[in-house]
């Protein structure tokens, strides 16, 4: 959000997959940086969690595959939630059929951050990036830690400051002993996770 999205106070941040561990972190960080946060999730239960974590508005989307009409309808939902100027930053954790409607709701010169794609690798019509004059940016934290260790250390220090200030807090929804680690993976695969799923070593 900071390095690739250049987030600032007053931005509109649209988060796809906002109720998982990464999504909840994005909600909290967005609010800490002064953004208006729109959380896109797949159920009422996840919508309630997103609101509890600080989301200003929530969009509940269906399950893909989407036909053209469904894709257009989702884009309209995103636009309505983001407001007339669109989302300054789209934080896409899910990919697949969800990505194109989000690009359609992006602001002029917005940033589309590709964070993950459990719903499949998105096929974006590149003409949309021209029409919106927007940037599509990959976000690969694992490689970043190796290539930019000093910057990463500074970010970690900032996260601890935000934690101390009570602006962010890990939300653990399930714990499994290592012997039942498969259940944790299944929970993630079935998109049942809300917040972090932890595997304990004891």
Describe each region flagged by the PLM.
Residues 1-33:
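Short internal alpha-helix immediately C-terminal to a glycine-rich phosphate-binding loop
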Residues 3-7, 81-84, 104:
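Glycine-rich helix-loop-beta junction characteristic of Rossmann-like nucleotide cofactor-binding loops
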Residues 9-10, 87, 109:
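Phosphate-coordination loops involved in phosphoryl transfer and adenosine-cofactor binding
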Residues 14, 88-91, 113:
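N-terminal Rossmann-like NAD(P) cofactor-binding module of classical short-chain dehydrogenase/reductase
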Residues 17-18, 94, 117:
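NAD(P)H cofactor-binding loop motif with strongest signal on the N-terminal glycine-rich segment
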Residues 31-97, 151:
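Adenosine-nucleotide cofactor-binding segment
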Residues 41, 50, 97-168, 200-202:
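Glycine-rich phosphate-binding loop and adjacent beta-alpha segment
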Residues 160, 165-174, 182-202:
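C-terminal capping/lid region of NAD(P)-dependent oxidoreductase domains
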